Amino acid sequence: MGQGLWRVARNQQLQQEGYGEQGYLSREQSRRVAASNMSHTSHRKHVQGGIDIYHLLKTRKSKEQEGFINLEMLPPELSFTILSYLNATDLCLASCVWQDLANDELLWQGLCKSTWGHCSIYNKNPPLGFSFRKLYMQLDEGSLTFNANPDEGVNYFMSKGILDDSPKEIAKFIFCTRTLNWKKLRIYLDERRDVLDDLVTLHNFRNQFLPNALREFFRHIHAPEERGEYLETLITKFSHRFCACNPDLMRELGLSPDAVYVLCYSLILLSIDLTSPHVKNKMSKREFIRNTRRAAQNISEDFVGHLYDNIYLIGHVAA
């Protein structure tokens, strides 16, 4: 970005000193007139002994013109893709170069909604003086604040009118963004069980295999590093949600939320057993089937075997 700004300033300086396009053409015309007055022999010798100065200058001019891409000449979708890789600081610098594009409200609206998929303010009439560029800066500032102190971050969003003071709205905001630090988010959800309840209901596990659904769940709601009450709460909530999303499958397999709870715990223990380098004697498929069916009766042996194969081939469910 710094190189691009330097290039713009340098081009302006060259134009002031007479090195713009008009200056270049006038000097080039003088050189060509002088070259035509040279003798055929000396000119031929010059061309053979060195580089064609006209070709060199023409190549240099074309390179200078092509050295910096004008985003206004690109399709809006491609421009949006390029600028979506920039953070707030770089976008501010970009606005100095691409002022019209960087101040486009549609661009900032797209950046806001692609990074923070849900905000309460999206569904409200915008207040006087509202701009998506300003909103992007506030969302970025609020995310950084959350990653330092979750409660202060949520309060910041509410003070700016970005989020309503509602567990459901906070849960939707968390579900639709990946800018929040997962360790801070885990602490926040452990303290705000009302937000956790609404966050769980946003997941749709319909027609998903149990281990894959559990992986998706733990990608959004990270599991604690140690066993305890919070992990039990997460598995309990997941089990009820999984059964609610797959009622036909539960009837077919004869599974209840309690049985799914047992299977989830078995999958977590199996994941640790198969992936930990400290465990020398890995659990076999036969042992897993026997232990699981002992804890949860009336479960198909083939179904439990497929659970083992999934962990063995794909890996940890809570990594």
From Swiss-Prot:
Pfam families membership: F-box-like (PF12937), Sec7 (PF01369)
Domain F-box: 68-111
PROSITE patterns: FBOX, SEC7
Keywords for the protein's UniProt record, in alphabetical order: Guanine-nucleotide releasing factor
Domain of life: Eukaryota
GO terms assigned for molecular function: guanyl-nucleotide exchange factor activity
InterPro entries from the UniProt entry: F-box-like_dom_sf, F-box_dom, FBXO8_F-box, Sec7_C_sf, Sec7_dom, Sec7_dom_sf
GO cellular component: ubiquitin ligase complex
Stretches assigned to coiled coil: none
GO BP terms, alphabetized: regulation of ARF protein signal transduction; ubiquitin-dependent protein catabolic process
Gene3D superfamilies per UniProt: 1.10.220.20, 1.20.1280.50, Arf Nucleotide-binding Site Opener,domain 2
Domain SEC7: 146-276
Protein role: May promote guanine-nucleotide exchange on an ARF. Promotes the activation of ARF through replacement of GDP with GTP (Potential).
Protein name: F-box only protein 8
Lineage: Eukaryota, Metazoa, Chordata, Craniata, Vertebrata
Encoding gene (name): FBXO8
